[in-house]
């Protein structure tokens, strides 16, 4: 290698080493402390659905063993409703995990550190289900135009708390903080519903109640119960017609299940249906009963001979066994006989009995 090339390589190596030493010297300097900048608090990851409008700060209100829940309506009747359906409901959700007594008291809020739930006749713009929540370090106040709005508000309160609040056992080492905020909310849609098919897969009364609880937590207000189809008839109909006991809708039509996990078939008595309706009403949810017809009617047709004009009183079957209920997943193979006057008499009787136990307008 020539002397010129050796010189150039040494010069390049020296420059590279100098640059490296300069870089390491700079990066090795002590890091200067920088004050962290707290981002504005947000509720977007906590609340479903997100309120129409809200402002939140970094401050907190903490529920403690001294916290009480005060409820006050515009009159005694409304106060009683708030006490049972809203105040005691909220307390029942908070007591197991906090271990606090959380007494529910009728009247004006006294002192600090409490939760107040009040109805105001000056908040008519909130409608039936709207609400406001004002939270400061000294307490939380729910204001609504109607008890339904106050009930929707406490679902927001539940979501504002740490997730452990939903546990049904005592949780230790958690500070039950709620971010200080102003929340103004009302539903965008009047009808916020869910559909539950209890025909193809029968759910017990307790199962339906749990489903209603889940709906309530997300401020839904309509439960559409699918009570009849080819695979089953799920509501008791009393009496007899044309010499046949309508209880056959239970003893035959309800003894089906398309479930693959061993769930038994079943039917709701009218008393059980009223129990479901009342449970939902306490959570400001309307039960909408639905009977599929004139199609999807195999469970009724195979149960009651008078609905069929055939010689043996059995439905036109096609490829299906018309001597027993159907437990498959096919659809579109059955229909009431629209030229049979007995069909309309049966439908009238079903609707008459359902109307007596269902307050729904549908």
Predicted regions and their residues:
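N-terminal secretory signal peptides that target proteins for export/translocation
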Residues: 1-8
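Sec-dependent N-terminal signal peptides
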Residues: 9-22
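Acidic, contiguous N-terminal accessory segments
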Residues: 18, 35-187
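Sec-dependent signal peptide cleavage junction
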Residues: 22-39
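Feature activates predominantly on carbohydrate-active enzymes
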Residues: 124-344, 350-362
